[in-house]
Amino acid sequence: MSQSIIESKNKKDVNNGKIPAKETILSPRFYTTDFEAMENMDLSINEEELEAICEEFRKDYNRHHFVRNSEFDGAAEKLDPETRELFVDFLEGSCTSEFSGFLLYKELSRRIKDKNPLLAECFAHMARDEARHAGFLNKSMSDFGLQLDLGFLTANKDYTYFPPRSIFYATYLSEKIGYWRYIAIYRHLEKNPDSKIFPLFNYFENWCQDENRHGDFFDALMKAQPRTVKSLSQKINIGGTTFTHPLFDYFHRFRYFLNNLPITSKLWSRFFLLAVFATMYARDLGIKKDFYSSLGLDAREYDQYVINKTNETSARVFPVVLDVYDKSFYGRLDKIVENNKVLSNIANSEENKVSKTLKKLPTYLSNGYQLLRLYLLKPLDSKDFQPSIR
């Protein structure tokens, strides 16, 4: 988060109208996890709620929602070059993010279906939704004569490993923040139809309900997980080499026990909330600001609304949430945005690599300091915070 926002194009050539996603520090990430631990999860503590959510997934409320209509005909040609570029960049990032979710959920459903069929079915339904979203976004890109090469992404994207617990935190927040982002844009454009630059936004109201249901699933899954893993793993990976021994299962059990201590849960909750909020804020105010302006939105007001709402929603599952109402909270995020502009200017200068690195160092340290101060802000206890949001 404290690094600069430097964009570098993939070296793969553009062929047949397809383009690979551009990489930035704040680009959507592709994830993998411990499939053995996932398949051994005991859902019995909250199985009834998970089964109810799975039944909702089976109904597939949006089966017939993502059908294009005549409003798309010629819509791309109506955009001026600057707005066109901003919107295509939005489509690319959104499509990559949805496709990332599809790959993770699809692989999970495939790998755990024999031992954990309920969990596997839920992930399969969510993979269906994410694939539908990614395809719909990619179809909109084709209106501009472009298309993301999703096959190339699958084969060449770097995958970040997260243990299951971290996957739960990260994907829960990703889905819930996606809900608030989409519904905020939809409501704004319903009130300001002249700012609706493309018919894609007409689909956001129902679309965001998919995100909301996915978030509810991870909420229920986390409630099922306080010390409920039947068996973890007899394997351990050191330096890329996997070792197997029954004793390693006890090591993983001890690590899992530590991760489930109340203080640990509070620390991780604060970490993931801050990581997600700071990343979004830095991206939207740093490199996406003009896109939101094209929709008639103030990026700062929009992000603060989304962060506040996501923080409130997270109090239903996390033991603590961030004090986003502290007067220093957004001030420090704004400082990070300013620092990232400085880092970007240095990166784009004509100086040599060593000189650039030395000039960037104080700004990196400043970003790290701002993030540390934000993390150390006294959090809000969810049990005290919840009544005001329900």
Curated annotation (Swiss-Prot):
GO terms for biological process: light-independent chlorophyll biosynthetic process; photosynthesis. One of its GO terms (molecular function) is iron ion binding. Pathway: Porphyrin-containing compound metabolism; chlorophyll biosynthesis (light-independent). NCBIfam families: AcsF, PRK13654.1. It is an enzyme of class 1 (oxidoreductase). This is Magnesium-protoporphyrin IX monomethyl ester [oxidative] cyclase. Its cofactor is Fe cation. Keywords: Chlorophyll biosynthesis, Iron, Metal-binding, NADP, Oxidoreductase, Photosynthesis. It comes from Prochlorococcus marinus (strain MIT 9312).
